[in-house]
């Protein structure tokens, strides 16, 4: 995993829309799709912090490193600012979750089976992180291959559908789990 000051590398993003307190729509995207839109739409490049320039060789700040801040709110604010240049639908905030949160949710809902690289894969609380890393190994840096974190999007879709029909007891457990995740900074909101 690639660590960042305010968490990990944001490989998968989701655009989530709520209307009248209800989930209206969601779309998952690879961070590099957002980076391409940002590069096409930005008018002025942002100089990256020294570590990003020095260690990653970037002459300008890529959107995936916008959160290179020790203060999550400052990094999220920069991300929102950069996001505006993409031409994508407007956003009102940023929610960051680590794979640990996905694991915790799978612990509540039970395993899911999704098709990864053309084969069904059973993903559960114990193997979700390993599956993400397996995808990194399988694709071995191939920039034309789907993101190794695409598995999060596949699992995320199933979890959203399950949670949208969950009973009250499961939703209460989810709230408790999210509270713990927020306390541990595995879930951050801006």
Region annotations inferred by a language model:
Residues 1-190:
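Non-catalytic, solvent-exposed segments at the cell envelope interface
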